[in-house]
Amino acid sequence: MSSRSIMGFDYGTKSIGVAIGQELTGTGQPLRAIKANDGIPNWDDIDKLLKEWQPDLLVVGLPLNMDGTEQEITVRARKFGNRLHGRFWQAVEFKDERLTTTDARARLFERGGYRALEKGSVDGVSAQLILEAWMEEQYG
């Protein structure tokens, strides 16, 4: 197992959750969410995060239907990942993210009740869960 740094994204039309993790430990930590306008992020904010954390790989969550089929937001998340690759020349992989938002809310609620359920916090923890699930899938 290598010690690559990996950045995870939870794509949304209003907010994009971000997390950073290390392959060596298989764990991630949520970073601040990036605001999006109808799914379009401020690319300068993403550029700053990439320069600060210098990840070796990006993982974008794919919001699939429960039966595994794609929906409109799935197509938009895939397009976001492709744009990350095109703009920043970073390797991008995709990860099924079904139920990560529900899991993120449950984790945050356990830690701090309703006050912990701020949108940016949920998105960041969702990105963390996507990232950790991707690493678990790779290295079990």
From Swiss-Prot:
<keyword id="KW-0690">Ribosome biogenesis</keyword>
<dbReference type="InterPro" id="IPR012337">
    <property type="entry name" value="RNaseH-like_sf"/>
</dbReference>
<protein>
    <recommendedName>
        <fullName>Putative pre-16S rRNA nuclease</fullName>
        <ecNumber>3.1.-.-</ecNumber>
    </recommendedName>
</protein>
<dbReference type="InterPro" id="IPR037027">
    <property type="entry name" value="YqgF/RNaseH-like_dom_sf"/>
</dbReference>
<keyword id="KW-0540">Nuclease</keyword>
<comment type="similarity">
    <text>Belongs to the YqgF nuclease family.</text>
</comment>
<dbReference type="InterPro" id="IPR005227">
    <property type="entry name" value="YqgF"/>
</dbReference>
<keyword id="KW-0963">Cytoplasm</keyword>
<dbReference type="GO" id="GO:0005829">
    <property type="term" value="C:cytosol"/>
</dbReference>
<dbReference type="GO" id="GO:0004518">
    <property type="term" value="F:nuclease activity"/>
</dbReference>
<dbReference type="Pfam" id="PF03652">
    <property type="entry name" value="RuvX"/>
</dbReference>
<dbReference type="InterPro" id="IPR006641">
    <property type="entry name" value="YqgF/RNaseH-like_dom"/>
</dbReference>
<keyword id="KW-0378">Hydrolase</keyword>
<dbReference type="GO" id="GO:0000967">
    <property type="term" value="P:rRNA 5'-end processing"/>
</dbReference>
<comment type="function">
    <text>Could be a nuclease involved in processing of the 5'-end of pre-16S rRNA.</text>
</comment>
